[in-house]
Amino acid sequence: MHTGEKPYTCEECVKLLTNPQALLYTGAFILNKNFTNVKNAAKPLLNPHPLINKRIHTGEKPYTCEECGKAFYRSSHLTEHKNIHTGEKSYKCEECGNAFYRSSHLTKHKRIHSGQKPYKCEECGKAFRQSSALNEHKKIHTAEKPYKCKECGKAFRWSRSLNEHTNIHIGEKPYTCEECGKDFTWSSTLTVHQRIQTGEKHS
């Protein structure tokens, strides 16, 4: 239905696009066909509310949690966040009964049951359930290692690898084998150890 209303367009969103020609103008907002490839632009482009869209660009977060001080763009996001403090998990999966604090977490979880993987790597075609997993995967192709150890300068592709590496410097071994009680610096080392334990038991 055409109301004659001009579509809301944001110059800041357009600047963020890698390919402005890929824009589709629909009724009240801009939709980019390749929004998964547009860094930091997916939400603004899919948001029909000019005020919320503006906050995303300016960084304004007027809704603050009284418990922890965390701030949000939208009141609905604050409402969902409060569930963490109250322990309430309002969003329940009809398939398996798992419950979640946020609707977005339930949406991601449902992809496990449906097998849906909407985020695809343009380099190799591998698909992922979450955009964050795709972003992490892309580092394999670029050889980018943005996470650097302040102690020794060693760099890593993933933040979790840096966190585990840091355990070497501080002497922490947070991964414990439930079978024998042995502690490990790396989760991968614990996994190998557990396989050996299992193999010994079945031999």
UniProtKB/Swiss-Prot annotation:
Pfam families annotated for this entry?
Answer: zf-C2H2
Taxonomically, the superkingdom here is Eukaryota
The subcellular localization recorded is:
Nucleus
Matching entries from SUPFAM superfamilies are given as: beta-beta-alpha zinc fingers (SSF57667)
**PANTHER family noted in UniProt:** ODD-SKIPPED - RELATED, ZINC FINGER PROTEIN 208-LIKE
Role of this protein: May be involved in transcriptional regulation.
Question: Member of which family?
Answer: Belongs to the krueppel C2H2-type zinc-finger protein family.
What is the designated name of this protein? Putative zinc finger protein 876
What species is this protein from? Homo sapiens (Human)
Top-down, what is the taxonomic lineage of the species of origin? Eukaryota, Metazoa, Chordata, Craniata, Vertebrata
Write the gene name: ZNF876P
